[in-house]
Swiss-Prot record:
UniProt-annotated glycosylation sites, renumbered to this chain: N96, N118, N153, N159, N193, N197, N238
Cytoplasmic face residues: 1-39
Protein's name in the database: Sodium/potassium-transporting ATPase subunit beta-2
Lineage: Eukaryota, Metazoa, Chordata, Craniata, Vertebrata
Segments for region (immunoglobulin-like): 193-290
Keywords: Cell adhesion, Cell membrane, Disulfide bond, Glycoprotein, Ion transport, Membrane, Potassium, Potassium transport, Signal-anchor, Sodium, Sodium transport, Sodium/potassium transport, Transmembrane, Transmembrane helix, Transport
Domain of life: Eukaryota
Sequence intervals crossing the membrane: 40-67
Family stated for the protein in its record: Belongs to the X(+)/potassium ATPases subunit beta family.
Organism, as annotated: Rattus norvegicus
């Protein structure tokens, strides 16, 4: 014989719920007395306080082993990468000569990017250094901070400096300037050579044919050793990265050209196919003419 439970009315359910929240007979709130609530809250307070203290202590111990100025591990940063300016989506530099808006955005980006390289700013913040040798600034037991940096003046970029340039870095005439920038690597030394240099080529035979002639600033795409080593953002406060400007003179119009630029030095390997971004950068260049 099945015994059916008596179905509670809505009022009974409400009364039971009210009694669960606050029972005036036992003075319990949500099934616990005030003392019980005090003990359980104290337990969780101590428990989570202990976890917080342990986390804080382990973080503090770890941070004592980390330098504010130099990364502890640099084995995966031995070879610097390259990047181009103007910075574009997918590294595609596309110029429509007759469409001002297509290249004006590049010009505005370059104006902002090159502003810190103005000769007046460089003379105010950085030193005139002796070329052909590293500008080393050892601590010798005493923290040598901040490190001084060598001047890289905008005028060194020649026809790509944008100073008094009616062609807007060549973008209005179909002879654009693309700037090659080497990423910063702390304590990087290029080797015993007097300088490094950037070289650019078409990736394939047809790209080489369509690329045409180009000139580089500084001459031969040289990057002097006096801009190295780099000591880090906090040490080298006013450090200015050296640049190489590539001015493309007669790119075949209306054709997409794949360009690859590399930095060459004794201590830089550019033939590692496992890392296609080591010491090189590839970008697409297209000059559209009506």
């Amino acid at each position: 014989m099945v015994i059916q439970k008596e179905k509670k009315s809505c009022g009974q359910v409400v009364e039971e719920w009210k009694e669960f929240v606050w029972n005036p007979r036992t003075h319990q709130f949500m099934g616990r007395t005030g003392t019980s609530w005090a003990f359980i809250l104290l337990f969780y307070l101590v428990f989570y306080g202990f976890l917080t203290a342990m986390f804080t202590l382990t973080m503090w111990v770890m941070l004592q082993t980390v330098s504010d100025h130099t990364p502890k591990y640099q084995d995966r940063l031995a070879t610097p990468g390259l990047m181009i300016r103007p910075k574009t989506e997918n590294l595609d530099v596309i110029v429509n000569i007759s469409d001002t808006e297509s290249w004006d955005q590049h010009v505005q980006k370059l104006n902002k990017f090159l502003e810190p390289y103005n000769d007046s700013i460089q003379a105010q913040k950085n030193d005139v250094c002796r070329p052909g040798r590293y500008y080393e600034q050892p601590d010798n037991g005493v923290l040598n901070y901040p490190k001084r940096a060598c001047q890289f003046n905008r005028t060194q970029l020649g026809n790509c400096s944008g100073i008094g340039d009616p062609t807007h870095y060549g973008y209005s005439t179909g002879q654009p300037c693309v700037f090659i920038k080497m990423n910063r690597v702390i304590n990087f030394y290029a080797g015993a050579n007097q300088s490094m240099n950037v070289t650019c080529v078409g990736k394939k035979d047809e790209d080489a044919e369509n690329l045409g002639h180009f000139i580089m600033f500084p001459a031969n795409g040289n990057i002097d050793l006096m801009y190295f080593p780099y000591y880090g953002k906090k040490f080298h406060v006013n450090y200015t990265q050296p640049l190489v400007a590539v001015k493309f003179l007669n790119v075949t119009p209306n054709v997409e050209v794949n360009v690859e630029c590399r930095i060459n030095a004794a201590n830089i390997a550019t033939d590692d196919e496992r890392d296609k971004f080591a010491a090189r950068v590839a970008f697409k260049l297209r000059i559209n003419k009506a």
